[in-house]
């Protein structure tokens, strides 16, 4: 097998998978957000399309890895916030509640077009978030590139009540899930 390419501009994903010596090529895929109820197909299709968009850019046979993360509250998908107000609204909506963080990973062989996809779900419960705490977080960390308006690795004390599941999954990609999916190509 040739090289492996991460079709992502996420520094968090690149860091989690750094031991794999992946080439990084940000996916040119443009996400079309349609506010729908959550389904695994939704996030898995985004991961697949991100990887697929890199295939024409590659000449030698390679494994292309795409990923997408969504935050889900009930059936509502909380994507990346549009602006400050949207980020504030999302974080206040998550206050005192348990939500799911779902990351889908797709791996495509650029030559054969064989692909495998899986999803990992983790759960996060937030404490009661004051307006001041939320405003301070948004002003300091500018979470506008993060699903659900937060990065768990940068949340200050006072945010998290409980985490269930794979922390890497919440950050952006589970190395365990990636390794398991990669086995299908060996």
Task: Give residue ranges: language-model regions.
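N-terminal polybasic phosphate/anion-binding patch
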Residues: 1-63, 75-77, 129-132, 179, ...
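GST superfamily/GST-like fold recognition
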Residues: 3-15, 121-186
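Mobile beta-alpha loop/short-helix "lid" or hinge segments that flank ligand
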Residues: 16, 20-29, 106-113, 143-157
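Residue-level signal for inorganic ion chemistry
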Residues: 17, 47, 68, 87, ...
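Active-site-adjacent loop/tail segments of enzyme domains
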Residues: 42, 69-99, 126
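Ordered, amphipathic secondary-structure segments that act as subunit-interaction surfaces
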Residues: 63-69
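Short beta-strand-to-turn element immediately C-terminal to the catalytic PLP-Schiff-base lysine
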Residues: 72, 106-108, 160-162
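Conserved core of the sugar-phosphate nucleotidyltransferase
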Residues: 91-140
């Amino acid at each position: 097998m040739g090289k492996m390419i991460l079709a992502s501009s996420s520094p968090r994903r690149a860091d989690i998978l750094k031991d794999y010596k992946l080439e990084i090529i940000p996916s040119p895929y443009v996400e079309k957000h349609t506010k729908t109820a959550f389904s695994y197909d939704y996030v898995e299709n985004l991961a697949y399309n991100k990887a697929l968009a890199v295939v024409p850019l590659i000449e030698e046979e390679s494994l292309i890895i795409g990923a997408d993360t969504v935050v889900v509250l009930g059936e509502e998908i909380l994507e990346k916030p549009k602006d400050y107000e949207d980020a504030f609204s999302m974080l206040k909506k998550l206050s005192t509640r348990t939500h799911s963080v779902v990351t889908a990973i797709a791996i495509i062989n650029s030559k054969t077009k064989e692909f495998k996809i899986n999803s990992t779900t983790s759960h996060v419960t937030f404490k009661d978030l004051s307006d001041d705490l939320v405003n301070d977080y948004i002003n300091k960390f500018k979470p506008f590139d993060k699903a659900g308006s937060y990065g768990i690795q940068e949340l200050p004390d006072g945010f998290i009540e409980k985490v269930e599941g794979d922390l890497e999954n919440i950050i952006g990609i589970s190395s365990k899930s990636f390794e398991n999916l990669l086995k299908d190509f060996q």
